[in-house]
Amino acid sequence: MAGLKDVVTREYTINLHKRLHGVSFKKRAPRAVKEIKKFAKLHMGTDDVRLAPELNQAIWKRGVKGVEYRLRLRISRKRNEEEDAKNPLFSYVEPVLVASAKGLQTVVVEEDA
């Protein structure tokens, strides 16, 4: 499958509200981190998912129980440059600042490299 081998960057909108429905208040932000990792693993097909510190701050901005309903994410599939890496690729997830995350479509971001 050639599609999984290439390096790509996409922007997604994740609806955390439906993923955190029914989760107790003191576990909402930690569960949001787990759900974002699961989302990135599903869409990028990599087991190694890394979150940007800015994304962690965006999740925890309103405290443990005040997680945003929707977040706009930029997920990049990159090559693992480490010598003894278990996986050849990893996903890097970072937040995108938008006024409102409602109604936005998934977009492939062109890299200027």
UniProtKB/Swiss-Prot annotation:
UniProt-listed Pfam families: Ribosomal_L31e
Classification via InterPro entries: Ribosomal_eL31, Ribosomal_eL31_CS, Ribosomal_eL31_dom_sf
Superkingdom of this protein's organism: Eukaryota
GO biological process, one term: cytoplasmic translation
Location(s) in or outside the cell: Cytoplasm
UniProtKB keywords: Cytoplasm, Ribonucleoprotein, Ribosomal protein
A GO cellular component entry from the record: cytosol
Molecular function per GO: structural constituent of ribosome
Note: There are 2 genes for eL31 in yeast.
Protein family: Belongs to the eukaryotic ribosomal protein eL31 family.
Subunit structure: Component of the large ribosomal subunit (LSU). Mature yeast ribosomes consist of a small (40S) and a large (60S) subunit. The 40S small subunit contains 1 molecule of ribosomal RNA (18S rRNA) and 33 different proteins (encoded by 57 genes). The large 60S subunit contains 3 rRNA molecules (25S, 5.8S and 5S rRNA) and 46 different proteins (encoded by 81 genes).
UniProt function note: Component of the ribosome, a large ribonucleoprotein complex responsible for the synthesis of proteins in the cell. The small ribosomal subunit (SSU) binds messenger RNAs (mRNAs) and translates the encoded message by selecting cognate aminoacyl-transfer RNA (tRNA) molecules. The large subunit (LSU) contains the ribosomal catalytic site termed the peptidyl transferase center (PTC), which catalyzes the formation of peptide bonds, thereby polymerizing the amino acids delivered by tRNAs into a polypeptide chain.
Protein name: Large ribosomal subunit protein eL31A
Taxon lineage: Eukaryota, Fungi, Dikarya, Ascomycota, Saccharomycotina
Name of the encoding gene: RPL31A
